[in-house]
Amino acid sequence: MLSEKQGEETMMSSLNETIELNEEREEEKGASPGSGFKNFLWHGGSVYDAWFSCASNQVAQVLLTLPYSFSQLGMISGIIFQVFYGLMGSWTAYLISILYVEYRSRKEKENVSFKNHVIQWFEVLEGLLGPYWKAIGLAFNCTFLLFGSVIQLIACASNIYYINDHLDKRTWTYIFGACCATTVFIPSFHNYRIWSFLGLGMTTYTAWYMTIAAIVHGQVENVVHSGPKKMVWYFTGATNILYTFGGHAVTVEIMHAMWKPQKFKAIYFFATLYVFTLTLPSAIAVYWAFGDQLLDHSNAFSLLPRNAWRDAGVILMLIHQFITFGFACTPLYFVWEKVIGMHDTKSIFLRALARLPVVIPIWFLAIIFPFFGPINSAVGALLVSFTVYVIPASAHMLTYRSASARQNAAEKLPKVIPSWTLMYVINAFVVIWVTIVGFGFGGWASMTNFIKQVDTFGLFAKCYQCPPKLPASNHTMHH
């Protein structure tokens, strides 16, 4: 038993030494004259940076669609699903962090260097479980992040329309596609320090604006809260919440940007607790005020009264969507760089040029499927369910299936989980629940709703869910 413990300590020492060396290098970089302020804004590898990145990335445009989900689910189910999926998301993010540390400790033991190389989830799967798992991880992760980026573009166009309706949403998508393409200049998550901080501040403002504005507005006349009304709506709403707390597809990249990745384990959980303070009050207040009207208004901004406070919320969410686009797209940039052999290039401008082809299909898909709201649920059911719930839980069970793997695990079981049996029971529950409820029922409901949107509005819809113009005015009709 003593030799096993010594072996484990040896295994982890290499990882610790490498990480400490990286931290020293970062400190040396910051020591040069005149670079202190730049490093303060640009270089972020602390626990706090990771927390801001997780919280900022987790709740973006989906904040605006959660009241819509509540109208489909009803108040009680909406609250329960938020808490349930928030905790489940934190659990699977924890599993991903454990697998990352396991993979990295094994590779460091083999003297593998990760200088100028960002470890990604599919590489962790390949290192621990083989090439088939790499293919599965790569396919699901890239497709999810691709559509995650598409959703941010759609949200930009949907939001700006509520300030300036002189251009249709499709035209705004063209404009914001060009703006979001500038994220190619941000090298990695290590350089998102100031953006993550600002992004979370913007989301916090918008969430509390929605809450206060809905309460001040009060309930609309003859308000009706009929949810849950239809099974299709119920599972569509539940799957949008599954999508909300499935933002940990970039966990590995965020961990790799940290100076001490082992400290990540509980960060996502604490980020989720903060996110609850934004998502629950805003969704509850807006649904309380507008009720079933939300069934035809997937973007909460469309029902809130137009004033300077709302316009500020729209603008801040636009900036935050630009940041979240970068979060979703950066792992895709890394994959593309590795494919074309540019990943270890030090020049920011050369890498930016190489990354541009990634933005083109995202731009195109945002113009084809402009269905803000329904597309979230479809992506949640078909992609998020496997990418960040089923695959991590299954991978964890398979990685530690042998007694020797469990004994030599780089990370011990958490104190709240006294045995491996309980660990396996929780993981099996996650896999079964998400496969049946998230992918099965959620997939059926989301695709039914998505196809209905295509039939109603058509592909390449010029202005999805835009109210008709008043004949005598250029302003949109107030609801």
From Swiss-Prot:
<feature type="transmembrane region" description="Helical">
    <location>
        <begin position="135"/>
        <end position="155"/>
    </location>
</feature>
<feature type="topological domain" description="Cytoplasmic">
    <location>
        <begin position="1"/>
        <end position="58"/>
    </location>
</feature>
<protein>
    <recommendedName>
        <fullName>Auxin transporter-like protein 1</fullName>
    </recommendedName>
</protein>
<feature type="topological domain" description="Extracellular">
    <location>
        <begin position="443"/>
        <end position="479"/>
    </location>
</feature>
<feature type="topological domain" description="Extracellular">
    <location>
        <position position="377"/>
    </location>
</feature>
<dbReference type="Pfam" id="PF01490">
    <property type="entry name" value="Aa_trans"/>
</dbReference>
<feature type="glycosylation site" description="N-linked (GlcNAc...) asparagine">
    <location>
        <position position="474"/>
    </location>
</feature>
<keyword id="KW-1003">Cell membrane</keyword>
<keyword id="KW-0769">Symport</keyword>
<feature type="topological domain" description="Extracellular">
    <location>
        <begin position="156"/>
        <end position="171"/>
    </location>
</feature>
<dbReference type="GO" id="GO:0005886">
    <property type="term" value="C:plasma membrane"/>
</dbReference>
<keyword id="KW-1133">Transmembrane helix</keyword>
<feature type="transmembrane region" description="Helical">
    <location>
        <begin position="422"/>
        <end position="442"/>
    </location>
</feature>
<feature type="topological domain" description="Cytoplasmic">
    <location>
        <begin position="335"/>
        <end position="355"/>
    </location>
</feature>
<feature type="transmembrane region" description="Helical">
    <location>
        <begin position="79"/>
        <end position="99"/>
    </location>
</feature>
<keyword id="KW-0927">Auxin signaling pathway</keyword>
<feature type="transmembrane region" description="Helical">
    <location>
        <begin position="232"/>
        <end position="252"/>
    </location>
</feature>
<feature type="transmembrane region" description="Helical">
    <location>
        <begin position="314"/>
        <end position="334"/>
    </location>
</feature>
<feature type="topological domain" description="Extracellular">
    <location>
        <begin position="287"/>
        <end position="313"/>
    </location>
</feature>
<feature type="transmembrane region" description="Helical">
    <location>
        <begin position="196"/>
        <end position="216"/>
    </location>
</feature>
<dbReference type="GO" id="GO:0006865">
    <property type="term" value="P:amino acid transport"/>
</dbReference>
<feature type="topological domain" description="Cytoplasmic">
    <location>
        <begin position="399"/>
        <end position="421"/>
    </location>
</feature>
<keyword id="KW-0029">Amino-acid transport</keyword>
<feature type="topological domain" description="Cytoplasmic">
    <location>
        <begin position="193"/>
        <end position="195"/>
    </location>
</feature>
<dbReference type="GO" id="GO:0015293">
    <property type="term" value="F:symporter activity"/>
</dbReference>
<dbReference type="InterPro" id="IPR013057">
    <property type="entry name" value="AA_transpt_TM"/>
</dbReference>
<feature type="transmembrane region" description="Helical">
    <location>
        <begin position="59"/>
        <end position="76"/>
    </location>
</feature>
<feature type="transmembrane region" description="Helical">
    <location>
        <begin position="266"/>
        <end position="286"/>
    </location>
</feature>
<keyword id="KW-0812">Transmembrane</keyword>
<feature type="transmembrane region" description="Helical">
    <location>
        <begin position="378"/>
        <end position="398"/>
    </location>
</feature>
<comment type="function">
    <text>Carrier protein involved in proton-driven auxin influx. Mediates the formation of auxin gradient from developing leaves (site of auxin biosynthesis) to tips by contributing to the loading of auxin in vascular tissues and facilitating acropetal (base to tip) auxin transport within inner tissues of the root apex, and basipetal (tip to base) auxin transport within outer tissues of the root apex. May be involved in lateral roots and nodules formation.</text>
</comment>
<keyword id="KW-0813">Transport</keyword>
<feature type="topological domain" description="Cytoplasmic">
    <location>
        <begin position="100"/>
        <end position="134"/>
    </location>
</feature>
<feature type="topological domain" description="Extracellular">
    <location>
        <begin position="217"/>
        <end position="231"/>
    </location>
</feature>
<feature type="topological domain" description="Cytoplasmic">
    <location>
        <begin position="253"/>
        <end position="265"/>
    </location>
</feature>
<feature type="topological domain" description="Extracellular">
    <location>
        <begin position="77"/>
        <end position="78"/>
    </location>
</feature>
<feature type="transmembrane region" description="Helical">
    <location>
        <begin position="172"/>
        <end position="192"/>
    </location>
</feature>
<feature type="transmembrane region" description="Helical">
    <location>
        <begin position="356"/>
        <end position="376"/>
    </location>
</feature>
<keyword id="KW-0325">Glycoprotein</keyword>
<dbReference type="GO" id="GO:0009734">
    <property type="term" value="P:auxin-activated signaling pathway"/>
</dbReference>
<comment type="similarity">
    <text>Belongs to the amino acid/polyamine transporter 2 family. Amino acid/auxin permease (AAAP) (TC 2.A.18.1) subfamily.</text>
</comment>
<keyword id="KW-0472">Membrane</keyword>
